[in-house]
């Protein structure tokens, strides 16, 4: 999977200047193609996770071009943009928490394959049908959780969730046909920490009993 911040604080720092959008959006599409070029010799990309879109109105982002660019090269790749859902009276309302999302609410960034709202978990009675241009689309919720405390590798990051806690989160996040991303940051050599591997094996045993 790939993480990409739509808002580049260096190249596109002045988000209020709409005259810069076209140039920046072209730059961004080229970057996405470059990332795919780098990864494809080694593996397929199964997910693109986009962030930072709330810094501009949704229509200023080339969501359709982003989607088509990725799908044309990685057809099975799933694509989501953080804080995917808006309000009927304001598609750019931010944030619309999962417990406040209702069937038929507008898809803020269309097209997308699933909903995001990091770091929140799905509501118990999570709706699935959301709207764009009068049509409804099925969109599960994806939760993003760290196996320890940090997203990125850090030598001081040694406080792990217990296998019982992870199993509970797994069931909570995947019921109702939803998705869980469990982050295990690789070290500086690109290897998963031994403690992560041990905990993942224990979790697998726990949830498959």
Regions found by a protein language model. Give the residues of each.
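Mature catalytic domains of secreted/periplasmic carbohydrate-active enzymes
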Residues: 1-209
């Amino acid at each position: 999977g790939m993480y990409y911040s739509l808002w580049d604080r260096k190249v596109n720092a002045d988000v209020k200047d709409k005259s810069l959008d076209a140039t920046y959006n072209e730059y961004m599409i080229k970057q996405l193609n470059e990332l795919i070029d780098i990864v494809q010799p080694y593996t397929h990309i199964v997910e693109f996770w986009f962030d930072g879109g709330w810094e501009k109105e949704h229509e200023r982002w080339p969501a359709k071009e982003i989607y088509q660019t990725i799908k044309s090269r990685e057809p099975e790749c799933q694509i989501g943009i953080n804080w995917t859902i808006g309000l009927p009276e304001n598609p750019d309302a931010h944030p619309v928490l999962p417990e406040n999302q209702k069937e038929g609410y507008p898809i803020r960034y269309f097209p997308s394959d699933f909903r995001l709202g990091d770091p929140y978990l799905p509501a118990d009675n999570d709706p699935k049908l959301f709207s764009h241009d009068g049509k409804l689309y099925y969109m599960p919720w994806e939760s993003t959780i760290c196996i320890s405390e940090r997203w990125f590798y850090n030598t001081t990051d040694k406080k792990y969730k217990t296998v019982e806690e992870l199993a509970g989160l797994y069931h909570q996040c995947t019921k109702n046909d939803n998705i869980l991303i469990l982050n295990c940051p690789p070290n500086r050599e690109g290897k998963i920490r031994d403690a992560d591997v041990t905990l993942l094996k224990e979790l697998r045993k726990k949830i498959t009993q």
